[in-house]
């Protein structure tokens, strides 16, 4: 009987931690919506980007990531495409690839997508049970401001 109670207690303890992360994801996660103004399809790269966006918008994230990757071969510094590739990989639960993309956007330091990259990177860390790394990024978001500041502050309070 004691062993059974210990087992049940252990399961509750470990699943409780995971459930907290799941609650956070359920409450605060929304897939990134790219700006509605799309590039004109004048070149092959823009046609690939437009098709990748179509896959992304229809939630075919695997095909979207492949095409975003193709776009990045000829335009590696396009941070919007890097972010979209990251979110596509995030949706496919390919967290190492997603983390790499979000880190690249953040490290670039000169683009309009840093807020989103920080947010999704922190969520990646939650999904891979790297709670301390997630907290660090949520703290940065909470202090620096930006579009996710309020959500980050609420999550920090919930993680303590």
Model-derived features: positions:
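Single-pass transmembrane signal-anchor helices and their membrane-water interface zones
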Residues: 1-24
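Short coil turns that delineate tetratricopeptide repeat
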Residues: 42, 76, 110-112, 146
């Amino acid at each position: 009987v004691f062993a059974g109670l210990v087992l049940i207690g252990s399961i509750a303890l470990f699943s409780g931690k995971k459930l907290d992360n799941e609650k956070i994801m359920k409450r605060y996660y929304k897939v990134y919506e790219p700006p509605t103004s799309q590039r004109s399809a004048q070149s092959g790269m823009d046609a690939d980007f437009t098709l990748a966006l179509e896959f992304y918008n229809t939630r075919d994230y695997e095909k979207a990531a492949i095409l975003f990757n193709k776009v990045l071969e000829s335009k590696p510094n396009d941070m919007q495409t890097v972010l979209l590739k990251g979110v596509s990989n995030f949706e496919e639960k390919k967290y190492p690839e997603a983390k790499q993309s979000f880190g690249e956007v953040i490290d670039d330091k000169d683009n309009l997508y840093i807020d989103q990259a920080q947010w999704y990177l922190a969520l990646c860390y939650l999904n891979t049970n790297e709670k301390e790394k997630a907290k660090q990024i949520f703290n940065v978001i909470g202090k620096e401001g930006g579009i996710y500041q309020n959500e980050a502050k609420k999550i920090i309070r919930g993680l303590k």
